[in-house]
Amino acid sequence: MSTNTTTTNATPELAKESVFFQSNHEDLKNRPKVRGYDFNEGVDFSKLFETYKTIGYQASAVGEAIDEINRMISWRLVDEPLKEGEDDDEERKVTRCKIFLGYTSNLVSSGVREIIRYLVQHSMVDVIVSTAGGVEEDFIKCLAPTYMGEFHLEGEKLRRKGLNRIGNLLVPNDNYCKFEDWIMPILDQMVEEQKTKGTVWTPSRVINRLGKEINHEDSIYYWAWKNDIPVYSPALTDGSIGDMMYFHSYNTPGLVLDIISDIRAINNHAVYSKKSGMIILGGGVIKHHICNANLFRNGADYSVFVNTGNEFDGSDSGARPDEAVSWGKIKLDAKPVKVYSEASIVFPILVAETFAKTFKKKSPEELKLNKRSIFD
């Protein structure tokens, strides 16, 4: 055993140099200082959320997401310099960023549905992508309610009672029976129109028709139909709608869905937009579908992702925005934001500090400019 340890009263130089290592402040000159909200100033939610950017961690990401969405909302073509051959006409004054909104089914099952409905009701977004569950759950809620439950409720007991659990929400199985009673006659009409009128049904056209038929102001897709906002669902059969189509194919066979027309339509929404923005809640097919459409314009200009996914498994859901930059799905000079959070916590805050604050009804000219042509 070594016995060369020397004990002195002087502090070892190595210890001092290691602990009191001098900082180079050059990289800190333009960085904001960490500071949270002072509740001595009273309760002011706008000021509170403004301080999120300097709180740190995911609060800072929320603050950055608020800024990114506000950039989407505020952009106008008329503010850009005229390019050679362009006219400074009325269309430039009403041309805005085209906003793509994507969300997974669990958010429509939750109370986030009402927030999404608000955005669609007031034409605040231009293109929607949802999973099948995000479509059917909206219609089912118009027919019967979803209830609060608990995460720990036992699956076996719930199954015996005919109660389906979505996290800490409960959906009586009777709701899906009511959904079947409502949708089957509509599917019959679709088959008839396909045969007699030559109607080509796409997932977006089906959702549009169902939005019209539900005729309920609580519905996201009622307002999407009314405001002519396209809703794409590339995996429309992956849910209760698919279950209904399965049963319907035995009773009234022949319904055909054309997915090629929809992929052309959503890609062209991106291709022909002057600026595009993506707000994506959750991951999976909805995230990739929107990002991939924006590849066709060499990337979105503005992007906000909200999900709990991590990138270590190589999943698209967990991928950071920088990975999308490498694929050409987000612009090289963009300032995308990912918030690592469950969307039901964050999205109400984002909407409160962006869309709801700047709400102003779009002019007829603005609405006309964003209308789709897929159903023409």
Curated annotation (Swiss-Prot):
Pathway: Protein modification; eIF5A hypusination. Keywords: Hypusine biosynthesis, NAD, Transferase. One of its GO terms (molecular function) is deoxyhypusine synthase activity. It comes from the Eukaryota. InterPro entries: Deoxyhypusine_synthase, Deoxyhypusine_synthase_sf, DHS-like_NAD/FAD-binding_dom. It catalyses: [eIF5A protein]-L-lysine + spermidine = [eIF5A protein]-deoxyhypusine + propane-1,3-diamine. Spermidine binds at residues 136-137, 243, 288, 314-316, 323-329. NAD(+) binds at residues 105-109, 131-133, 137, 238, 283, 308-309, 342-343. GO terms for biological process: spermidine metabolic process. Its EC number is 2.5.1.46. Catalyzes the NAD-dependent oxidative cleavage of spermidine and the subsequent transfer of the butylamine moiety of spermidine to the epsilon-amino group of a critical lysine residue of the eIF-5A precursor protein to form the intermediate deoxyhypusine residue. This is the first step of the post-translational modification of that lysine into an unusual amino acid residue named hypusine. Hypusination is unique to mature eIF-5A factor and is essential for its function. Belongs to the deoxyhypusine synthase family. This is Probable deoxyhypusine synthase. It comes from Dictyostelium discoideum.
